[in-house]
Every structure is written in C-alpha cells, then in structure tokens.
Curated annotation (Swiss-Prot):
Family per similarity comment: Belongs to the class-III pyridoxal-phosphate-dependent aminotransferase family. HemL subfamily.
Source organism: Listeria monocytogenes serovar 1/2a (strain ATCC BAA-679 / EGD-e)
Protein name: Glutamate-1-semialdehyde 2,1-aminomutase 1
Keywords from the UniProt entry: Cytoplasm, Isomerase, Porphyrin biosynthesis, Pyridoxal phosphate
One Pfam family, short name: Aminotran_3
Entry's EC annotation: 5.4.3.8
CDD domains reported in the protein's UniProt record: OAT_like
Modified residues (N6-(pyridoxal phosphate)lysine): K268
Amino acid sequence: MQNYSKSEKAFKEAKKVLPGGVNSPVRAFNSVDASPVFMDHGKGAYITDVDGNEYIDYVLSWGPLILGHTDPAVVNAITKAALKGTSFGTPTEIETELAKLVIERVPSIEIVRMVSSGTEATMSAIRLARGYTKREKILKFEGSYHGHGDSLLIKAGSGVATLGLPDSPGVTKGLAADTITVPYNDIEGAKLAFEKYGEEIAAVIVEPVAGNMGVVPPIEGFLEGLRELTTKFGSLLIFDEVMTGFRVDYYSAQGYYVVTPDLTCLGKVIGGGLPVGAYGGKKEIMEQIAPAGSIYQAGTLSGNPLAMNAGFETVRQLTPQHYDVFRTLIKRMEEGLTEISARRQVPLSINKAGSMFGFFFTDQKVINFDTAKTSNLEFFRNYYREMLGQGIFLPPSQFEGVFISTMHTENEIDKTLEAFDTTCKILRG
C-alpha cells in the first residue's frame, strides 16, 4: 500500500496560499475523490512523488514531455541557455531556428509567432481571424477546450467537465452570443450553423483530434467538410494543435489527416516542458499582426530563450520512426485492455491517435462529448485510485487524454496491463 503522508501534508499547506491548493483545477484530484500527489522528480517514463512512490507516467505534464522526463539533450540545452541569461526582452537567434523547424514540420505554417502558452495562442489566433475577416462570430465544438480565454470557455470540455460546470462565471453574455457551438464530429450541424450565420463567422476553431473529452479522433469527412465550409463562406479554419501538434504524427495531425487549415495553434511539445505557445499560418494572414500589420499582440516573455532551446531540442530529436513505435505500443495497449476488459466483464471503449489514447468505461463508441459522458464515472474514480496504488500515474479525469513518450517500452505497457487486470479483478470481484 502506498504512503501519501508527505503529499497530504504538502496539500494542506498549499491550500493556505493557493486557490484550492493548486495552480490548475484538474491537479486537485477532485474528480477522483482523492488528495493530489505531489511530485518530486522524473526520469524517462517514470515519475516519483515526495513520499518516494514511483509511477509509470502517462500524464507527462499533460502532454509536453514526448521524450520523457529529464531528456539529457533537453536538460543540457536549457542549462547552457540559462548560463547565458534567462531572458532578454530582445530577439534571439534560437527563436528563428525553432520557427524554421516548426515551419518545416507543420504543413499550414508559413510564418509563426511565439507566445507563452496554448491559451495565448488560441486567443491570439481568434483575434487575428476576427481582424482579418472583419467578422465577429466563432464556431467551436462542444467538449473542446481551447484554453481559458473568455470567448472559448463555452461548452469547453475537460476543464469544466471535470468540475461538473457547464460554463465559467465571468464569461459575459455578449461573448457567449458570438460563440456558436455544435457537437464534435457533426458536419451537418456545422453546415446548419453556416446556413444561418455564415456571413458573420470569422473562423471555425477545432481540435483535429479532440483531446479534452478524452481522446476522440475525427470521423471520415469531418475535417474535410470543415475545410470546404470555411472556404465556401470566406471564414478561416483554425486547427488547435496545442495537444496534437507533434503528438499525432511527425507532421502533426494536419499532416496525418491531410487537411490544411488557415491557422494553427501549437503548445506543449514545442516547449519541451517549459511554457510555450505558438500560432502560425499563411503569410498573407500572419502579416496582419503587429508590427508587420495592425492587429496587436505582444508578450514580455514571448520567445523566452530557455523555452525556445528546450522546444528546439525536443522537436529536433523526433523522427518518423518514433511515430511507428508509438503506434505499435498503443496497439499493444489497446489489444491488452480489450482482452482484459472482456474477460473481466468491464465495458470499455478505446480511441487512439499517434502517441495519445483515451479509454471510456462504456459500451458506446465515443465520437463526441455526449458519448464520452456515457462513461461510468464512479467506476473511473475507483479504477483511478487502484491504478495509482499500483504505480500507474494517469490523468485524474475521465475527460483527459493519456500520453506515452519515446521512453515508454513494451515493459511499461505490460506492467500497466497487469495493473489494469488486477484493478478490474478487485473492482468486479
């Protein structure tokens, strides 16, 4: 049995000075009826808490650590950069080098602007879309989280779903009125929205693989249909690849599905574990941003040299072969989970995309937020605590994606399957 006494003490202290004891809501472990685990250090595919408990890590800092914890080349790049200075507030050459690498790997990006978070990226892309098209309305999909910008916190998936909140107080009615929502994977719903509001819609923002209702890939024709609609009505298509960028494929999700948006938002992996976001796209559109154009966006720490070096070294190391290995490992996980769940009579639905996957305790095929919510949340809570006790660290929410890294091997997958079998046996009796 795991001992969590130091984590419990740390959480008690944190609650005195931080809202809810955390700096991001899902970290509080509320949806699994547990106290959060405070981590101390990580190495490769493993993470260790302050009590000395070691776990196979499938959270990976919510996706950024595609090379695993403390990758030597990334750590070395950060260290060398820090010795020169942590921030200058001026251009640096490494910004250009990372930008070139992003442009090389992401089909839609001709020019890219670096920011400090995924939320900044999506907020800035929305402003750019509105300024470029001279329109105000945005179409998004139910259950998709695009950061905590006000206009995007409408039916926003994992963040609010984990807390059981439909929206966030503080989001004005005016902003909500300019945000149109339809179910994910519902191209007919999108067509109806365009029939009604088409001349007013500045952009459609979509996760090419939804990652904040679990992991939900696009059905055939969905992304292609959005590309056709936005082109027809003169709206921009924005892919939020903050999560899927460099996770789904060497060329990101847009490369894998062969659909090219007008703008792309990035984050997570391109920071190598440090705070980074980016948005980019067609030169004609991106040159509307100041100082090249009149649409304003700025940031004190945008292009921070530590983050740029970490991101460059992370993306540089990734090869097409890594994605072949990711798919092989996740197929092994899927086959094992499917066999065990059938044998233990546990309803289970599994989705996957590149180096990320999601599973739901339901008999239904999960294709949108409504079907994701059919998962047995009480079973998930009990399952989560049992898996944690067996050294498997998963996202503490049914509506978050699960990630692997280049440091995960068949050994970690098999240990996880063994823990899953034991957990199902305990919970099913």
